[in-house]
Amino acid sequence: MVSSSSYDVSAALKQEGLKSSDWDEICRRLGREPNRAELGMFGVMWSEHCCYRNSRPLLSGFPTEGPRILVGPGENAGVVDLGDGHRLAFKIESHNHPSAVEPFQGAATGVGGILRDIFTMGARPIALLNALRFGPLDDSANVGLMEGVVAGIAHYGNCVGVPTVGGEVAFDPSYSGNPLVNAMALGLMETKDIVKSGAIGVGNPVVYVGSTTGRDGMGGASFASAELSADSLDDRPAVQVGDPFLEKGLIEACLEAFDSGDVVAAQDMGAAGLTCSCSEMAAKGGLGVELDLDRVPARESGMTAYEFLLSESQERMLFVVKAGREEPLMKRFRRWGLQAAVVGQVLEEPIVRVLHHGEVAAEVPATALADDTPIEKHALLSEPPVDLQEHWQWTEAQLPDLADPAAALLGLLDDPTIASKRWVHRQYDQQVLANTVVSSGAADAAVIRLRPQQGDGSLKTTTRGVAATVDCPNRWVALDPERGAMAAVAEAARNLSCVGSEPLAITDNLNFPSPETPKGFWQLAMACRGISEACKAFQTPVTGGNVSLYNETRRDDGSLQPIHPTPVIGMVGVVDDITKVTGLGWCQPGDVVVLLGVKPDADQDDRVGLAGSSYQQFTLGTITGRPPRIDFDLEKRVQGLVRQAIADGLIASAHDSSDGGLAVALAECSIASGFGVELTLSVGTMSPARLLFAEGGARVVVSVKADQLTRWQTMLTSNPDVSTTVLGTVASHGRFQLSFGVGSTIDLSVDQLQQVYADALPRRLA
């Protein structure tokens, strides 16, 4: 018989983030009232963070299959086939709410958690990336959040020995008090078989390995599924504390154990801890799990069943092991200084049964926790919200005339979202493992050499690599979620193409406000539609990801400040020859600068524009209008040509035009290289602001090698559908000279551009 407990139901439901209707459904499924431990289990497993109760119907529309997809959504991480026997596991997840109240540990444990998702599949982590959002840095609170988050990411990644090779950082008032911390990890499969999480074999022992269990991280999943308020600092106990050195040992021990063949299923203990790992293993396997809490290694005395089940102590794993092989396996982990204990067994009956002090502390059907969970039904607006329809009436004619183009360019280079992120990147070890080909700031995507271990532990020599990037134009998404989400996928694919990589698949992190408002759910639904359409167009299936809702801060007056909807796209691709990878900087004076994509003087082309642009924000202090239309066919033609030109050795550099438009993209190429340029743009009837700073248009700036111009022209002849515009040449002098119109020129020293670009963040953080 399950032990009972007396408690205040209303208070308990509020604490667990459950509704009265949830209580009724829980009682119906159990055939009785739940005790306090069981209610806690339902609270975490029925939270948005764990069961996607608001977003699951929308996610079902994503394309998830393809010739390269080995593992799609539903496992700890997606896995793609890179060819030549290489398999890549990758995933992105958020740690937003914990980072808001405890930025260092919140960000650090976000890194630890995503690494566990990777090596739980049997993959050795080879790289980390992150996507970060903060409020303006003129607020000391936002400065403190940024400093803590970056330090936490650096601490965990550097100590565990995995390079942080790329990412993006952006700033907007909507993120004040609610930063976004999305961590992505990549891993190279080292096991013959991919390790799955579904329980196998009735009677097989369930083995706990890793760190001890304490009271840290209590209720973290429920905490992550509610909005932030002035009282959120009181939720610091819901933030976990990580130990990267212990995780390093856990990585090595797990990979050894998986290679032995003794482990038949594995699940890391992340959100909802033991509750989630037990219920998911049972539900996926169609079996049950019995868990004896008296056997769980504990770091604190007197812990209740509720505390054991909801603890989110870090660096812990749960295995199902072949019967009779548990002792050799546990010895392996103890050699690495890790805890290891048999804590239960696989049951034929599909339940999660929890024992504590010789009594049944909880007994719940596994599918009720991890599979057959509630789905919230929201009505979808039949048309865009009124405020967005009003925004879409804005035209570029309402912008003031551009009086000083050079000052505008310098102002945009001083924008923290555009400016150099060296202050961030220099805190990360980007070269540990010695496989980083290009990393943050040097190219549009990170590239990592593929050097898998042989059976004897030696490294296989290869010139192949994998490229990765994270992207999201959050201003565009705020104004048009569907177009903005399409643009996120398109930009990610463009960034990979700019290093010569063929895009393969994505992982997504959907950071959104509350879905309980009509506008909030519409934003989420439209963004999902945009991602789906774009992924189908680029043939980049979704392998999994994360949904983080209720990203909004309650002001002192009780109103809510929602973030910009921010669907971050993590994309991976294969690089056939890392010796041909291109960076964004010019390489040689005399090389010809060419723009691919929509021509600079395309005045009425709705594929480029200033609505939602960095220039609009810089000029007006706000954003309005409707972002440019995404042309998938043009994107694919441009990207295919760039990849072909890189493979054939025709171009020396490639850089996509995104934040700040064409002038900023060109300036960034000079900043990265130190070389000047002599460029001329045809104006036509366009305004100078649109000519220089319009965004969109599937644009990529390349520098064609001077000695390859004939071959370049031959390639263009065979690709007549790709629009190209010769802009000028790379110069040996150190000046950025950009002429447009009659007598209009931006003429600045590259040194000045570099100084403004480099000082923007340090000056604000000083």
Swiss-Prot record:
SUPFAM superfamilies in UniProt: PurM C-terminal domain-like, PurM N-terminal domain-like
Single GO MF descriptor: phosphoribosylformylglycinamidine synthase activity
UniProt binding sites for substrate: 94-97, 116, 240, 312-314, 548
Active site: 49, 95
Keywords recorded for this protein, A-Z: ATP-binding, Cytoplasm, Ligase, Magnesium, Metal-binding, Nucleotide-binding, Purine biosynthesis
Binding site for ATP: 52, 91, 508, 545
Binding positions (Mg(2+) 2): 117, 268
Pfam family name, one: FGAR-AT_linker
Catalytic activity of the protein: N(2)-formyl-N(1)-(5-phospho-beta-D-ribosyl)glycinamide + L-glutamine + ATP + H2O = 2-formamido-N(1)-(5-O-phospho-beta-D-ribosyl)acetamidine + L-glutamate + ADP + phosphate + H(+)
BP-aspect Gene Ontology terms: 'de novo' IMP biosynthetic process
Pathway membership, UniProt: Purine metabolism; IMP biosynthesis via de novo pathway; 5-amino-1-(5-phospho-D-ribosyl)imidazole from N(2)-formyl-N(1)-(5-phospho-D-ribosyl)glycinamide: step 1/2
Positions bound to Mg(2+) 1: 93, 546
Transmembrane spans: none
First-tier enzyme category under EC: ligase
A GO term from the CC aspect: cytoplasm
Origin: domain of life: Bacteria
The EC number(s) this enzyme carries: 6.3.5.3
Subcellular location, record wording: Cytoplasm
Functional description taken from the UniProt entry: Part of the phosphoribosylformylglycinamidine synthase complex involved in the purines biosynthetic pathway. Catalyzes the ATP-dependent conversion of formylglycinamide ribonucleotide (FGAR) and glutamine to yield formylglycinamidine ribonucleotide (FGAM) and glutamate. The FGAM synthase complex is composed of three subunits. PurQ produces an ammonia molecule by converting glutamine to glutamate. PurL transfers the ammonia molecule to FGAR to form FGAM in an ATP-dependent manner.
Subunit structure: Monomer. Part of the FGAM synthase complex composed of 1 PurL, 1 PurQ and 2 PurS subunits.
Similarity annotation: Belongs to the FGAMS family.
Annotated protein name in UniProt: Phosphoribosylformylglycinamidine synthase subunit PurL
Organism: Synechococcus sp. (strain CC9902)
Gene coding for it: purL
